[in-house]
């Protein structure tokens, strides 16, 4: 079980809301979010209701303003707790529909293009665990939650293009 607290103002001030499960519409509880405290679990935040828009991965810790979670604004309108798993494995493909060169990953990768010599990833298959895909190396840029399943095209994970800069396993240990 996880617990996250949203605050309307910076530095954990103003009205707050405690959440312990997925919530498709946080607008019912607050109009803006400028700081967050994650007491337990790993969470994915979304800038719009129903798990839409920019995504932000948070793990246990304090985030005194939205820049600390790489937010673009004070808009957090839905959230999802990410289940903990002990093993992680995914396969990356250079073409859509699992075609072309395939590479397997079981650990974090700070620079996908450098490690696999693939400039773009068009499809992937998450076999075990949850992952966060970042569009830029070193865990920067837009973030996308990858749950176990098939992603036949980059649109399936919400990407605007096939850029994959880095991948990180969702664990509460780093």
UniProtKB/Swiss-Prot annotation:
The record's InterPro entries line, in alphabetical order, gives: Beta/Gamma-Crystallin, Beta/gamma_crystallin, G_crystallin-like
Report the residue ranges that make up the Beta/gamma crystallin 'Greek key' domain in this protein: 2-40, 41-83, 88-128, 129-171
Give the keywords, sorted: Eye lens protein, Repeat
Which GO molecular function terms does the record list? Answer: structural constituent of eye lens
Gene Ontology terms describing biological process: lens development in camera-type eye; visual perception
> Which domain of life does this protein belong to?
Eukaryota
Q: Sorted alphabetically, which Gene3D superfamilies does this protein's record hold?
A: Crystallins
Against SUPFAM superfamilies, the record matches this protein to:
gamma-Crystallin-like
Connecting peptide, as annotated region: 84-87
Per the record's keyword annotation, is Repeat included, yes or no? yes
Q: Does the keyword Ubl conjugation apply?
A: no
Result when mutating residue 80 to H: Found in a patient with congenital pediatric onset cataracts; uncertain significance
Q: A Pfam family for this UniProt protein?
A: Crystall
Domain remarks: Has a two-domain beta-structure, folded into four very similar Greek key motifs.
Quaternary state and partners of this protein? Monomer.
Q: What does this protein do?
A: Crystallins are the dominant structural components of the vertebrate eye lens.
Family per record: Belongs to the beta/gamma-crystallin family.
Tell me the protein's name. Gamma-crystallin A
Q: Where does this protein come from, organism-wise?
A: Homo sapiens
């Amino acid at each position: 079980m996880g617990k996250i607290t949203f605050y309307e103002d910076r530095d954990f001030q103003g009205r707050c809301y405690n959440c312990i499960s997925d919530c498709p519409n946080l607008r019912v509880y607050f109009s803006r979010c400028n700081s967050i405290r994650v007491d337990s679990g790993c969470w994915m935040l979304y800038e719009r209701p129903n798990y839409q828009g920019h995504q932000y991965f948070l793990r246990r810790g304090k985030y005194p303003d939205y820049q600390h979670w790489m937010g673009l604004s004070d808009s957090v309108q839905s959230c999802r707790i990410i289940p903990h798993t002990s093993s992680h494995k995914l396969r990356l493909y250079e073409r859509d529909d699992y075609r072309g060169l395939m590479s397997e990953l079981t650990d974090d990768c700070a620079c996908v293009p450098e490690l696999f010599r693939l400039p773009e990833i068009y499809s992937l298959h998450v076999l075990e665990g949850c992952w966060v895909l970042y569009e830029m190396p070193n865990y920067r840029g837009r973030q996308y939650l990858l749950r176990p399943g098939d992603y036949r095209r980059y649109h399936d994970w919400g990407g605007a293009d096939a850029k994959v800069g880095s991948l990180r396993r969702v664990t509460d240990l780093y």
